[in-house]
Amino acid sequence: YDQYTNQPVTGIQSIDNKLYYFDANGVQQDATFGIDVSKYQSNIDWEQVKTAGVKFVIVRIGYRGYGSGALVLDPMFEQHFTNARNAGLKVGVYFFSQAVNENEAREEAQGCAYVLNGRKLDYPIYFDTEASGGSNGRADGLGVEDRTKCAIAFCEEVKAQGYQPGVYASTLWFRKRIDLNRLKSYSIWNA
């Protein structure tokens, strides 16, 4: 119960610096907490993350440039990957895609496999599809069919490279910008 309102707490709550999840009735539920990190989170106290109850980390491995289309390694990838592992956390990765066709999506997946170089993952390699910062990214104008084809091409290439594939998007994108029904054979990460 909330100490101020005396009402049941719901959702994710931090109690004594530990994370807990409560359903709509205030009943504590089993939950596994994870975080995603990239260059935007540069100073992470990994022991504090673990102590807070986080069990896994999805690290951004890279992205494709909004305008140029160049593949870019996230400058914090190696540090985040290594430090999360050293803290005893399970790890997966995601790639922020701006692929505009299936060949580019496969290229992104191949780039992930190249950087990982055989390293084992506990969670998938996720195809991250979302709008660019100013909605001026090269893939922002893709229709549902083309975006779905890109996601499938990425995931199939990830499988061919020996890794588990997944797709990461918001609820809105899974409803309106990509065909979720065609992605059911892949891990789904809903943001």
Annotated model-derived regions:
Residues 35, 49, 84, 127, ...:
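Conserved, mostly hydrophobic/aromatic
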